[in-house]
Amino acid sequence: MTASTVYVDVDGTLVGPGGDVLAGDGPRLIGALLGCRAAGIAVVPVTGRSRIQVRELCRLLGLPRGIAELGCIHLEGREVRYELGAFPFLGETPVERMLRDGVLDVVLAQGLEPHEPWNEGREATYLLRGKVDEAAVSARLAAAGHSWCEVVDNGVLRRGGHVYHLAPTGTGKAHGVRVDRRHHGIARADTVYIGDAASDLACADDVGECWLVGNAEPELDWPNRTTGAHGDGVAEVLEQLLA
């Protein structure tokens, strides 16, 4: 297995419970990240986290760039690029529009609740939690005149239920990976993706090889699954690339 770029989910994959990057065998993960840096392999976080969170993560771990808010925000050094899909409005962020135009009221009426405190500082997607049929909720949004946004399932919460993003239609992790590959001229075959949820498997067609870490949702049927959980699983894949 070879690759010049490794896309990696953050929560539940790169970091363990509580956002702990040293969960499990922390030195092993740090060693693998250092090995990738020395070998010129770019490790790129792809996450639902906000722009500020991803910028700080990249700075702390020495990562070259990152993809925030489920593919909507691309960061590289001081450069920030917004990829907002079907969002049609100027002069405001998608989240500002969601809050101002009653979009949030539609989804809250379907049994979801804000996933606080994690909405602070968000620009493109709004975090919700609960358990719904996301396609049905997205259809309700379209019927209410808000077809520019949709509900996206981003995985299972430790305490039960799912976390969802209210996001511009046409965005998502897979779209973020495609945009990053195109921007940097990276061939599909030269990439690997590591994640733990269905939203990560959605990226499989856009990379050369896709892996789930050992703690990934058990109902996900996928042949490439690491033995280790969280960062140990990430290190397992990176070590194969470095061998």
What are these regions (language model features)?
Residues 2-22, 45, 204:
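Asp-based phosphoryl-transfer active-site loop
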Residues 24-118:
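Active-site phosphate-binding/coordination module
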Residues 2, 26, 167, 174-243:
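Mg2+-dependent phosphoryl-transfer enzymes with acidic/Ser/Thr/Gly-rich catalytic loops
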Residues 19-20, 55-59, 79-80, 139, ...:
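Short amphipathic alpha-helical segments
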